[in-house]
C-alpha cells in the first residue's frame, strides 16, 4: 500500500524588541545567565504583566506579510503547565483569538512550479526560560529567555513532502527577515521549528494519526527528520501496526527520531482568558501604519530584477537571499552601477570574502557607492579586473574611495604606449635567450614576453594594450 504524506509546521519566531513582552527586562541574546531578569520574570507574588506595544506592532506586521486577517479585538490566554523554566506555572499565550489568522504564502518547488501553503494562525506569546543539566549532578535555570516575545506561525497541513516543508521554511524565513521583526537565526534560537506529520492511504480524505517532531535545529534536519518519519510510519502501517499520537525528537547522531512522550492535547493545558491583561483593540489606522512600514518582499524583488534589469532567475534568487544584500544591490544600481556587473561582484568576490570572514554585508566597510566607483574605474581602464580584486579587499576592510586608494597606492593601470614601449624594449634586452628563440621560430616563444612585461610593470600594464604593443614590437624583431 502506498501512502500520502501530510505535513504541517509550527514555527516559533523570537521578535527583536529591546525589552520583553510583559516586563522591562532586556530581550537581547547572549548575556550572562539571569542577567536579563526582574521580579516579573521571576513571578514574584503580586507582580503584574505590562504589555509591550512593540510586540503587537511586530505581530501586525507579520500577519500582513503573511497575507493574514487580523483580529480587531485581541486578547491573551493562560496556557497552564509546570516546568522549572516556567516559574509562573503558566504561559501567557493566545488561544481562540490569535493576532492573525487565515493567511498564506507561495513556495517555489524544485521543478520550478509554485504552490500556495495556507497558514492557519499566528499568535503572540512569551518564551520560556532554559534548563541546563550540569555534569555536577545539578540542573540550572536561566530565565534570560523567559518573557522574550514570540510569534508562533502555524501552517495548515498543506505540505505533501519533506521537500515542500523545506521550501516553506525557506520562504517563511525570507519574509520574516525582510520585515525586520526578527533576525530568524536558528543557531541562536530565534527561529524554532516543530513538525507534525502523518500518513494516509492515497484517496482517503481523513488524516492519519500525527506525530510531532522536535529538536529540529536546522532546515536540513527538518527535512531529514521528516524523511525518516515517512519511512518509519509507512513501514509500521504496512506491517499492521498503529501510529500513536506522540512527540519524538530528531537525533542527529543516529539520523533518526526517538520517542520523547505521548502527545498532550489542547485540553491538557486548561486554557482560559488571561485576567491580568485587557482586551486590545486594533483599528484600521494602526494596521495601515504597520503596513506602510513593510518593505517590498523577495518575490516582488525577484520579478523586478528579472523583468526590469534583465537578470537571470538564479541571479535574482541569490540577490534576494537577505534583505541587506538586496538593499545593497538596489542602492548600487540606483547610483548608476550596471546591474549585471554589480550582481557578479556581489555573488563572486564579495560572497567569497564574507564567507571567509564569517561576516554579513552590513559588517564590512564596502558600500554601494564605492563598489560602483570601483566597477567604473575597471570599465574606464584605470585598473584591471585582476587588480580590482586587491582594491576590493581594501574597500571591504577599510572603506573609502576606490579611485583615491588606487592613485595613492600606485595601482593605476599603465595604458600609455609612450610608457609601455620603452619597458618592452628593456624586456627584450633583459631576455636575450627568449628573443633568440622567437627569432628562430620556436613554437609559442612569443608567449613568454607577456609574463616578462607584466612582471616588469608589477602587473599594472593594461593587458589589452600590452598585447597589442608586444605584437607590434615582436613583428619589428622578426622583420
UniProtKB/Swiss-Prot annotation:
<keyword id="KW-0547">Nucleotide-binding</keyword>
<dbReference type="InterPro" id="IPR014746">
    <property type="entry name" value="Gln_synth/guanido_kin_cat_dom"/>
</dbReference>
<comment type="subunit">
    <text>Heterotrimer of A, B and C subunits.</text>
</comment>
<dbReference type="InterPro" id="IPR018027">
    <property type="entry name" value="Asn/Gln_amidotransferase"/>
</dbReference>
<dbReference type="GO" id="GO:0070681">
    <property type="term" value="P:glutaminyl-tRNAGln biosynthesis via transamidation"/>
</dbReference>
<keyword id="KW-0436">Ligase</keyword>
<dbReference type="GO" id="GO:0050567">
    <property type="term" value="F:glutaminyl-tRNA synthase (glutamine-hydrolyzing) activity"/>
</dbReference>
<dbReference type="InterPro" id="IPR017959">
    <property type="entry name" value="Asn/Gln-tRNA_amidoTrfase_suB/E"/>
</dbReference>
<dbReference type="InterPro" id="IPR023168">
    <property type="entry name" value="GatB_Yqey_C_2"/>
</dbReference>
<comment type="function">
    <text>Allows the formation of correctly charged Asn-tRNA(Asn) or Gln-tRNA(Gln) through the transamidation of misacylated Asp-tRNA(Asn) or Glu-tRNA(Gln) in organisms which lack either or both of asparaginyl-tRNA or glutaminyl-tRNA synthetases. The reaction takes place in the presence of glutamine and ATP through an activated phospho-Asp-tRNA(Asn) or phospho-Glu-tRNA(Gln).</text>
</comment>
<dbReference type="InterPro" id="IPR004413">
    <property type="entry name" value="GatB"/>
</dbReference>
<keyword id="KW-0648">Protein biosynthesis</keyword>
<dbReference type="GO" id="GO:0005524">
    <property type="term" value="F:ATP binding"/>
</dbReference>
<dbReference type="InterPro" id="IPR042114">
    <property type="entry name" value="GatB_C_1"/>
</dbReference>
<comment type="similarity">
    <text>Belongs to the GatB/GatE family. GatB subfamily.</text>
</comment>
<keyword id="KW-0067">ATP-binding</keyword>
<dbReference type="Pfam" id="PF02934">
    <property type="entry name" value="GatB_N"/>
</dbReference>
<dbReference type="GO" id="GO:0050566">
    <property type="term" value="F:asparaginyl-tRNA synthase (glutamine-hydrolyzing) activity"/>
</dbReference>
<dbReference type="GO" id="GO:0006412">
    <property type="term" value="P:translation"/>
</dbReference>
<dbReference type="InterPro" id="IPR006075">
    <property type="entry name" value="Asn/Gln-tRNA_Trfase_suB/E_cat"/>
</dbReference>
<dbReference type="Pfam" id="PF02637">
    <property type="entry name" value="GatB_Yqey"/>
</dbReference>
<dbReference type="InterPro" id="IPR003789">
    <property type="entry name" value="Asn/Gln_tRNA_amidoTrase-B-like"/>
</dbReference>
<dbReference type="InterPro" id="IPR017958">
    <property type="entry name" value="Gln-tRNA_amidoTrfase_suB_CS"/>
</dbReference>
<protein>
    <recommendedName>
        <fullName>Aspartyl/glutamyl-tRNA(Asn/Gln) amidotransferase subunit B</fullName>
        <ecNumber>6.3.5.-</ecNumber>
    </recommendedName>
</protein>
Amino acid at each position: 500500500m502506498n501512502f500520502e504524506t501530510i505535513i504541517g509546521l509550527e514555527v516559533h519566531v523570537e521578535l527583536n524588541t529591546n525589552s520583553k513582552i510583559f516586563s522591562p527586562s532586556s530581550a537581547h541574546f547572549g548575556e550572562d545567565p539571569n542577567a536579563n531578569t526582574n521580579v516579573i520574570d521571576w513571578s514574584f507574588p503580586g507582580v503584574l504583566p505590562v504589555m509591550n506595544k512593540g510586540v503587537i506592532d511586530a505581530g501586525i506586521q507579520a500577519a500582513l506579510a503573511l497575507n493574514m486577517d487580523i483580529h480587531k479585538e485581541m486578547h491573551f490566554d493562560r496556557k497552564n503547565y509546570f516546568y522549572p523554566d516556567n516559574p509562573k506555572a503558566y504561559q501567557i499565550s493566545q488561544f481562540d483569538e490569535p493576532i492573525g489568522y487565515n493567511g498564506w504564502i507561495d513556495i517555489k518547488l524544485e521543478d520550478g512550479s509554485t504552490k500556495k501553503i495556507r497558514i492557519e494562525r499566528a499568535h503572540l506569546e512569551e518564551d520560556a526560560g532554559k534548563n541546563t543539566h550540569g555534569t555536577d549532578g545539578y540542573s540550572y535555570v536561566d530565565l534570560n529567555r523567559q518573557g522574550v516575545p514570540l510569534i508562533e506561525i502555524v501552517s495548515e497541513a498543506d505540505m505533501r513532502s519533506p521537500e515542500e516543508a523545506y521550501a516553506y521554511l525557506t520562504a517563511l524565513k525570507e519574509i520574516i527577515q525582510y520585515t525586520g521583526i526578527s533576525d530568524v537565526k536558528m543557531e541562536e534560537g530565534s527561529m524554532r521549528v516543530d513538525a507534525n506529520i502523518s500518513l494516509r492511504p492515497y484517496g482517503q480524505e481523513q488524516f492519519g494519526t500525527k506525530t510531532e517532531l522536535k529538536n529540529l535545529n536546522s532546515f536540513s534536519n527538518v527535512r531529514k527528520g521528516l524523511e525518516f518519519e515517512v519511512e518509519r510510519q509507512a513501514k509500521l502501517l504496512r506491517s499492521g501496526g498503529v501510529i500513536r499520537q506522540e512527540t519524538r525528537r530528531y537525533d542527529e547522531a543516529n539520523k533518526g527520531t526517538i520517542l520523547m512522550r505521548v502527545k498532550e492535547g489542547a485540553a491538557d493545558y486548561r486554557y482560559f482568558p488571561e485576567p491580568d491583561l485587557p482586551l486590545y483593540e486594533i483599528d484600521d489606522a494602526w494596521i495601515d501604519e504597520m503596513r506602510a512600514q513593510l518593505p517590498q518582499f523577495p518575490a516582488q524583488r525577484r520579478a523586478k530584477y528579472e523583468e526590469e534589469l534583465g537578470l537571470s532567475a538564479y541571479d535574482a534568487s541569490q540577490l534576494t537571499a537577505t534583505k541587506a544584500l538586496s538593499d545593497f544591490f538596489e542602492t548600487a544600481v540606483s547610483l548608476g552601477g550596471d546591474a549585471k556587473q554589480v550582481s557578479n561582484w556581489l555573488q563572486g568576490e564579495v560572497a567569497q570574502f564574507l564567507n571567509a570572514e564569517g561576516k554579513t554585508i552590513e559588517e564590512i566597510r564596502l558600500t554601494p557607492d564605492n563598489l560602483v566607483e570601483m566597477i567604473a574605474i575597471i570599465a574606464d581602464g584605470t585598473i584591471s579586473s585582476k587588480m580590482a580584486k586587491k582594491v576590493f579587499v581594501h574597500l571591504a576592510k577599510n572603506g573609502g574611495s576606490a579611485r583615491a586608494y588606487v592613485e595613492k597606492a600606485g595601482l593605476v593601470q599603465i595604458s600609455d604606449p609612450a610608457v609601455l614601449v620603452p619597458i618592452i624594449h628593456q624586456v627584450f634586452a633583459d631576455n636575450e635567450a627568449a628573443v633568440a628563440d622567437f627569432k628562430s621560430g620556436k613554437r609559442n616563444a612569443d608567449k613568454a614576453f607577456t609574463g616578462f612585461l607584466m612582471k616588469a610593470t608589477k602587473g599594472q600594464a593594461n593587458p589589452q594594450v600590452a598585447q597589442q604593443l608586444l605584437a607590434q614590437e615582436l613583428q619589428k624583431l622578426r622583420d
